[in-house]
Amino acid sequence: MTIKRGWTKVGLVLALTIAPVPAMAQGLGLNASDGEAFLNAVKEGDANKALELANQPGSRVANYRGYKGDTALHIVTRKRELQWVGFLLNKGADPNIGDSNGDTPLIIAAGIGFEEAAAYMLAKGAKVDAINRRGETALAVAVQQRQPRLVELLLKAGANPDKADRVSGYSPRDYAKRDTRNPQILRLIETIKPTKKAVSGPVIN
């Protein structure tokens, strides 16, 4: 991860310990120019600028959705930038906001095998059974993308393996049964019990 203007990785790690601010409703009352500036700062790894904008009184830039539908948390999750994921969550980024496809950052993390980020999002209130526009949960995506570690993490967090999507009508368990080349995923679904109650509900689009 590139960090500009004299920041070190240690400095950014220290910034992650700042107490989080409450997550706000996506997009409401946000200054678009500040929001776009924040997204650009995050994309460019400019920690000083990101902090400057996020620390403004009443700032809600952490939940600003850009013109393509992404929040900063979507962007850094796709780029697998764990330090930025932590920074944004500690600045009040809502892990339940969907992008233009309805994918939450957790769904994205599940699809690419970004286990550390997924665990942090769940700890910060990500809804494990939130769905995208196709009706897919993070677990369904993890099963389809053959991500056993994410499947295990999500099941332990209470993900429902029998929640069918809207497109095929298949559930994560159904997808796992059809994937005969990867029987370990079905074994996980059949054996792992949740260690905490699942949080479900609609995403913010």
Model-identified regions with their sequence ranges:
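Ankyrin-repeat boundary/linker signal
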Residues: 65, 98, 131, 164-165
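Bacterial N-terminal signal peptides
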Residues: 11-19
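Ankyrin repeat A-helix N-terminal signature
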Residues: 40-45, 75-81, 108-114, 141-147, ...
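Start-of-repeat signature of ankyrin repeats
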Residues: 34, 69, 102, 135, ...
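Ankyrin-repeat-protein effector appendages
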Residues: 2, 25-40, 157, 167-168, ...
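Ankyrin-repeat inter-repeat connecting loop/turn
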Residues: 60-62, 95, 128, 161
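Ankyrin repeat structural motif
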Residues: 46-55, 81-89, 114-122, 147-155, ...
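Bacterial N-terminal signal peptides that target proteins for export
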Residues: 2-11
